[in-house]
């Protein structure tokens, strides 16, 4: 007895694989991370639980998000210097997330949305870093 795999296409139908780039996916992941962070910053400001040094009124926050979204655009570039710049930035931001942010993430900020934003934001940064490392190594992903 031989097994025949089921297909969802009619016989003779040609299916072409969709392709994409690491840069496009990294950019999308970074835009999602920074958008979530912006939403949380606005939420914390409106709720009065923000870190006073990082609010919608401070130049630090505006600068951070301008650079973050700029890095998301830079992630689409194919040059090695751009790839290294993005990975260097991600290393710095992850260092801040792991070593500095816990010192200012006080009881007042530890809301359900605060924890959600923190965990998802860091997860997205780690995902972007993984994609960036694979891209820098010139790893090609193929369907199994």
Regions from the language model: what does each represent?
Residues 32-37, 54-76, 88-95:
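Core segments of alpha-helical transmembrane spans in multipass integral membrane proteins
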Residues 19-28, 122-144:
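Membrane-water interface at the C-terminal end of transmembrane alpha helices
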Residues 85-102, 123-126:
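Hydrophobic alpha-helical membrane segments
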Residues 50-60, 108-120:
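Non-cytosolic membrane-interface motifs at loop->transmembrane helix junctions
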Residues 20-32, 80-89:
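Interfacial segments of alpha-helical transmembrane regions
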Residues 18-26, 41-55:
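Short juxtamembrane and helix-loop transition motifs at transmembrane-helix boundaries
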Residues 2-12, 136-144:
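Short, charged juxtamembrane terminal tails flanking transmembrane helices
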Residues 84, 98-117:
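Membrane-helix boundary connector in multi-pass membrane proteins
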């Amino acid at each position: 007895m031989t097994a025949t795999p089921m297909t969802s296409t009619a016989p003779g139908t040609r299916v072409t694989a969709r392709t994409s780039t690491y840069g496009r996916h990294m950019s999308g992941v970074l835009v999602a991370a920074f958008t979530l962070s912006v939403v949380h910053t606005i939420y914390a400001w409106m709720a009065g639980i923000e870190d006073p040094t990082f609010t919608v009124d401070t130049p630090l926050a505006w600068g951070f998000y301008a650079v973050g979204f700029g890095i998301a655009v830079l992630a689409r570039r194919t040059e090695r210097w751009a790839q290294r710049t993005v990975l260097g930035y991600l290393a710095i931001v992850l260092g801040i997330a792991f070593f500095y942010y816990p010192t200012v993430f006080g009881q007042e900020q530890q809301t359900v949305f605060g924890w959600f934003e923190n965990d998802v934001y860091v997860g997205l940064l780690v995902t972007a870093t993984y994609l960036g490392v694979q891209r820098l190594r010139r790893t090609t992903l193929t369907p199994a």
